[in-house]
Amino acid sequence: VFENSVFIKNTLLYCSIAAFIDIVLAFFISYIVLRTKIIGRQLLDYVAMSALAIPGLVLGIGYLRTFYSFNLPWNDKPLASWWFMIVIILAVRRLPYALRACNAVLMQISKYLEESAESLGAQKTTIFRKILIPLMMGGLLAGFITSFSTATVELSATIMLVSTESDAPLAYAIYSYMQTAAGR
């Protein structure tokens, strides 16, 4: 398993991309849920947290059934066999961890900071870039680390989506090795 570094590279790549997707989504979902009055914001929070209630195997089967009938535009392989689907399922499964980290830190930031910047003429993008993101950096980093570290050991969903050994993450490779006579 450790003689071939492709598994480690895949794991680092997949989990890094998934954790980055998680913190970006978690930042915006947290902001929408905690700072806006949009109708349905609680539903958005519940949908984002629902990944904890759905087993990974069920999610993997759902992704296979959904994306197997669509082909990639540059070849005739099904969309479900593309390595980025593993990244997407890792991001979906770990989004609640990043979301709770972002919620916790955003609840501690006073709304008055945003309101005072807005009253001084700052745009929303400037408020995000210069006030919210620097103040939330600890929560974003905690969400990234939690999402990344828990995604590295995810097996139940990825086992359904790995189509070739060259796309497999380390957890899948360890599982495959344990199924051989040498791994027992």
Question: Could you say what each language-model-derived stretch is?
Answer:
Residues 17-48, 111-113, 124-131:
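Transmembrane-helix boundary motif in ABC transporter permease subunits
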Residues 8, 33, 50, 113-120, ...:
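Short hydrophobic faces within alpha-helices
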Residues 24-28, 61, 85, 92-114, ...:
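Membrane-embedded alpha-helices of multi-pass transport/permease systems
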Residues 12, 16, 20-28, 54, ...:
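Generic alpha-helical transmembrane segments of integral inner-membrane proteins
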Residues 1-3, 152, 159-184:
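Interhelical loop and adjacent transmembrane-helix boundary motif
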Residues 1-20, 36, 179-183:
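Periplasmic/extracellular loop-to-transmembrane helix junction in inner-membrane transport proteins
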